[in-house]
């Protein structure tokens, strides 16, 4: 029986990214290689954080986050075995904080998905915030 261990060189580390990978793919760790494999034998990698925090995310609703990421094609797609999934959404609107796991077929793809998701999420949040302020200003006239 192989158990996964995640080394977090910080306080408060979690196994959420590994558990998300397991739940999304029904894959497993291969004891011989140490790689996470899908049921069809494809290796998957992830990059994750439980502390994506930015002032631009404050006031954003979880449905807005999903819309922004889905419109950019960065949500997790089981057919492509790549994309981002989110947790800690209860902290999003009030604190501008969330957790995210980005999955790819190798380290480079997981990192590229992660970086693209952060970039698009922050840009989309800024655009939505600006549009909301414009609506408030128009309503006040």
Q: What is each of the regions a protein language model found here?
A:
Residues 1-141:
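ATP-dependent carboxylate activation and anion-phosphoryl transfer catalytic cores
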């Amino acid at each position: 029986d192989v158990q996964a261990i995640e080394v977090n060189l910080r306080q408060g580390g979690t196994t959420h990214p590994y558990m998300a990978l397991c739940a999304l793919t029904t894959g497993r760790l291969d004891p011989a290689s140490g790689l996470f494999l899908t049921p069809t034998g494809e290796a998957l990698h992830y990059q994750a954080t439980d502390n994506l925090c930015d002032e631009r995310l404050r006031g954003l609703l979880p449905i807005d986050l999903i819309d922004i990421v889905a419109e950019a094609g960065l949500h997790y797609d089981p057919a492509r075995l790549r994309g981002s999934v989110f947790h800690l959404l209860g902290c999003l609107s009030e604190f501008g904080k969330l957790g995210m796991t980005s999955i790819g077929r190798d380290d480079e793809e997981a990192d590229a998905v992660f970086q693209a998701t952060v970039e698009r999420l922050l840009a989309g949040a800024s655009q939505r915030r600006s549009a909301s302020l414009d609506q408030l200003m128009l309503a006040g006239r």
